[in-house]
Swiss-Prot record:
One of its GO terms (molecular function) is DNA binding. It comes from the Eukaryota. Expressed in seedlings, roots, leaves, stems, flowers and siliques. This is Protein DEHYDRATION-INDUCED 19 homolog 3. Pfam families: Di19_C, zf-Di19. One of its GO terms (biological process) is response to water deprivation. The modification Phosphoserine is found at S116. Belongs to the Di19 family. Phosphorylated in vitro by CPK3 or CPK11. GO terms for cellular component: nucleus. It comes from Arabidopsis thaliana. The keyword Phosphoprotein applies. PANTHER family: PROTEIN DEHYDRATION-INDUCED 19 (PTHR31875), PROTEIN DEHYDRATION-INDUCED 19-RELATED (PTHR31875:SF26). It is found in: Nucleus.
Amino acid sequence: MDSDSWSDRLASATRRYQLAFPSRSDTFLGFEEIDGEEEFREEFACPFCSDYFDIVSLCCHIDEDHPMEAKNGVCPVCAVRVGVDMVAHITLQHANIFKMHRKRKPRRGGSYSTLSILRREFPDGNFQSLFGGSSCIVSSSSSSNVAADPLLSSFISPIADGFFTTESCISAETGPVKKTTIQCLPEQNAKKTSLSAEDHKQKLKRSEFVRELLSSTILDDSL
């Protein structure tokens, strides 16, 4: 009876949690680690693929990569088989781990969230492969975020510089082309005039030939 009532309470809490936080991954990305703190982070094995993550990354990983399996598994923290959503169980029953994990500060989403993901996926800072060498335009609304983070500006600036360099090269090349086109206009008009005169002569010759042919035919018939 006690276990059934506990399961009912946990299931009810899970539903309330899902209604309150529709996107849990975004919620976890809403915290940034304070720079300069490199203390040991406790890691837990994913109960579905055995990869190791810290507590926040584990919840994001389960929520994104194992959404269908998350309702039946063994909790990596307390080693108890859970019959409800695993992420909800961890966040509700082991909330103290989140507090002890690290001091964190709330932040807004946007480019900072994207930067955190890029840092996790590309720890060596090689972000250029994401853009495939294509040009990138940085909007004015995100310029303050770029300036605030030197790592973000380090990989956006070369791309933006390449874009403006290419644009300047194109404008420099189109200038002489326009001048050449303007210079060629009189020559083209002269060619058109000469061609029209030749066409007129050809038409006159053809009309004379037709008249001669008709006149000869009429004369032959009269004879």
